[in-house]
Amino acid sequence: YGLVGSEMCIRDRYSDASVFTSTEGAQQVLIGAYDWFTNGHYAHYTNQYIFFMPDVMADDAMVNSTGNYNRFVSPYQYSITPSSTYSVDPWIGCYSLIDNCNAILDNLETLPESSERNRIEGESLALRTYAYHYLIRMYAKPVNKYPDNPGVILRLTSSTTDIPRSTVKDCYVQMVNDIEKACTLLTGTSSSSKCYITEQAAHGIAARIYLDLGDYTNGTSHANKALSEITLMS
């Protein structure tokens, strides 16, 4: 709900055409995308819970029946239904984040050329890739075994036209292209806050994608870049 609130505030004050005439306006929309990770109901499923659900569905964690308020019980028991919040909310949350990123990427040409525009584009591409990487792992089969199976819907613009699911392979091709471009655009960026995607974070996302593909050469290269200039426990 944080994204909706922040985006609605912007739209109350500015038209869609005027908000993207400055990097400051585009930055506000980008902050709205980040809000999906931190605020509101869907944030639990698009960020906080995605790290726990795979663990409880594997052998890495168990659900404590005492004081747990029934959380993660259905993933733990493999009893998730199509209408379950564990099924629906990650989809809604990730595509809402993707929609914010698409709004920025659709309007980049209206922004003056600058290093700030490059950073905003890079962060938007990396965020969108992060969301798609989670979606493809949750709602599709592994790329190394089922590349031609249905993946997820690759919505790359703000258009609301219905489109079919792309193949798993095509989804990974898109993610690789986007995250490689993001790594280039974010070269040399840094942030005093750990809340925003920087060059190292983009390389970390890329490393995970390449590992899924079994491309260990590129995976190792990006992982090393992600760890560069970062000390243990930093």
Report the location of each language-model feature.
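Single conserved hydrophobic/aromatic residue that forms the stacking wall/gate
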Residues: 1-5, 10
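Inward-facing hydrophobic residues that define packing positions of alpha-helical scaffold repeats
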Residues: 30, 98-101, 172, 179, ...
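Hydrophobic-face positions in mid-chain alpha helices that act as interaction patches
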Residues: 61, 72-73, 214-234
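Conserved, well-structured interaction surfaces
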Residues: 68-138, 166, 184-188
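TPR/Sel1-like alpha-solenoid repeat signature
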Residues: 125, 203-210, 222
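Short coil/turn linking the two alpha-helices of tandem helical-hairpin repeats
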Residues: 136-143, 190-191, 212-215
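Short coil/linker segments at helix-helix boundaries
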Residues: 138-169, 173
